[in-house]
Amino acid sequence: VSAYVVHALMVVVALFMTAIALSGVVGGPLSSWIMQAFAGVNGWAGWQWLFLLEGIPSVLVGIAVYFYLDDSIAKAPWLTEAEKRLLIDNISRDEGTRGDHSLKQVFRNGRVWLMASIYFCFIMGLYGISFWLPQLVKTAGVKDVLDVGLLTMIPYGLAAVAMVLASRSSDRSGERRWHTAGAGFIGGIGLILSGIFGGDLALAMAALSLATMGILTSLPLFWTLPTSMLRGSAAAAGIALINAVGNLAGFVSPFMVGSVKDATGSTTAGLYVLAGSLFLGGILVLLATRGRQHSAQLAAA
């Protein structure tokens, strides 16, 4: 995404991150089929085959990326010299409008830590829905493993559409603040409704779809905020810091929901905690961007 200027970044990031939603569309039924079809083959459990067969493509793609993905625009062999100059000039012009920060300033910048906190809150919701969506569908009355996988396609499919539509709306209007916070709020509302209507399949699926749409849409919208603040080596350090802090939620979220489920026999209380995290993330977005109508103005801070 470093080849795109800020005003065009939103749709690009959203299209890139729709891979998360599309992997849910494909991965749900595929995982269910693997677990059913391969259970007992070679003496392995279905989940063991699942890990093997779905892990191999990731390894192969990683190898391909190492050889194919270039470090910079200047090294891209599939661009002409004129295209390289145009892109480099556009990026240089765009970066000139952002504040310059040293690495030391990044780690001492309260706004960067605030962004990391926002990302942590949103990732709490992402991992919660990723790990527990099949279980929530099962709780709503679906017992067959393959049926559960097929039904999980619905929230992820709708989320992929929502991500693109919301990003286009944000780019057209230039408004980032309420788009980002609103996505977090919608995700939180969806999780609360999922807890309330967990026993009704139709209502539960509608609520889970709303939650998934809000959670996944919040992620590409969020990334326009820190990327508009920082540039150069400071951008790499700042984004790495935000990622590191935010992805701690990858451990906290599933563990927390699982612990609540073990203690209460239900995931409902865990859903409410995740909803609270999303609401907090949305509120922090509004606080972090007070007085700024879109992310381009954030650089003036």
PLM segments and residue spans:
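Symmetry-related core transmembrane helices of the 12-TM Major Facilitator Superfamily/SLC fold
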Residues: 48-67, 271-286
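Glycine-rich segments within core transmembrane alpha-helices of 12-TM secondary carriers
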Residues: 10-35, 57-58, 243-253
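Small-residue (Gly/Pro/Ala) motifs that create kinks and tight helix-helix packing interfaces
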Residues: 23-36, 61, 65, 134, ...
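Extracytoplasmic gate region of multi-pass secondary transporters
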Residues: 104-167, 219, 223, 253-254
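Paired intracellular helix-loop junctions of major facilitator superfamily
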Residues: 1-10, 225-236, 265
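C-terminal transmembrane helical hairpin of 12-TM major facilitator-type secondary transporters
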Residues: 174-225
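Helix-to-loop junctions at the C-terminal end of transmembrane segments
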Residues: 162-175, 261
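A late C-terminal transmembrane helix in Major Facilitator Superfamily
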Residues: 24, 229-266, 274
